[in-house]
Amino acid sequence: MHCPFCRHADTQVVDSRVSEDGATIRRRRRCPACDKRFTTYERVELALPSVVKKDGSRTEFDRRKIVASMQLALRKRPVAADAIDAAVARIEYLLLGSGEREVRSERLGELVMNELRALDTIAYVRFASVYRRFEDVSEFEDVIEEFRRASSPPKPSRKR
């Protein structure tokens, strides 16, 4: 690696450490020509699929957009930032695992809704109301009824 100070072609690694999350390697380097030290970070470059919007246009996957939309839905809700990061990481993992080069925005929205459903029901309803473009109260009621059915315990069978 070139020295950022004198542009010498070869530098020496003095120390390497793996970050706490295991996703990054921090390296301290020294230039033998000018004797200056600097730090580099090494991480895996992930090739996430492009997002195909409803109008057919394509854009790069942007983790920040997913985080921002989840934060908006979770505003003033008791959900930690770490939980949001973990949810987005699960979405990225699913997208990477699919092997697809493109993902439709509708599919991405469904993945976000699934994560929000597990994190906070209020946030899920907020996101769904915008994402699915609710037009009246009955659509809210349908989603709430769906939650009630899913969360009610099964009735015990009677054996004789």
Swiss-Prot record:
Co-factor requirement: Zn(2+)
Pfam families: ATP-cone, Zn_ribbon_NrdR
Descriptive protein name: Transcriptional repressor NrdR
Organism: Paraburkholderia phytofirmans (strain DSM 17436 / LMG 22146 / PsJN) (Burkholderia phytofirmans)
Keyword Ligase: no
Upper classification of the organism: Bacteria, Pseudomonadati, Pseudomonadota, Betaproteobacteria, Burkholderiales
One of the GO BP terms on file: negative regulation of DNA-templated transcription
Similarity comment text for this entry: Belongs to the NrdR family.
Function: Negatively regulates transcription of bacterial ribonucleotide reductase nrd genes and operons by binding to NrdR-boxes.
Coiled-coil zones: none
InterPro entries documented for this protein: ATP-cone_dom, NrdR-like_N, RNR_NrdR-like
Keyword field: ATP-binding, DNA-binding, Metal-binding, Nucleotide-binding, Repressor, Transcription, Transcription regulation, Zinc, Zinc-finger
Ranges annotated as unnamed zinc finger: 3-34
Cofactor note: Binds 1 zinc ion.
UniProt GO molecular function: ATP binding; DNA binding; zinc ion binding
Chain ranges of the ATP-cone domain: 49-139
